[in-house]
Amino acid sequence: MGIRKIYKNKTVAQLRALAVIHFHKYIRKRDEGKPCISCGSYTTLQAGHFYSAGNHPSVRFNEDNVHGQCLRCNFYLSGNLIPYRENLIEKIGQERFDKLELNIQLAKRTRYKWDRFFLVEIIEKYKALNK
């Protein structure tokens, strides 16, 4: 309960921004030394979402949806999704990929609203994993 006190005066938007910082740092750390999920280049990686975080908020913090991706693919090629998909299935397997797609289909039927407690859990989980 004491940990949550430091987040008491933060808005949901502020909590989401903090969660993004810690989650993306974890993804970059997890995929450090690996090639870009889309083009295979070895360069500085960003946290690239297969399903965009803006259009699909329910999988914004799903580790199967976010992988190390170079700036060129992530930003200039809008995710470079065709090779991303092929390499993603190879990396996580067809079963986990199908589960990710199912989550997307189910989420399309509902409006997603961020929960303060969920965001605090994300912040604390990835803060700990980044140590």
List the predicted regions and their residue ranges.
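Short, surface-exposed acidic
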Residues: 92-102
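Short cysteine/histidine-rich metal-coordination sites, predominantly Zn2+-binding motifs
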Residues: 51-58, 85-93
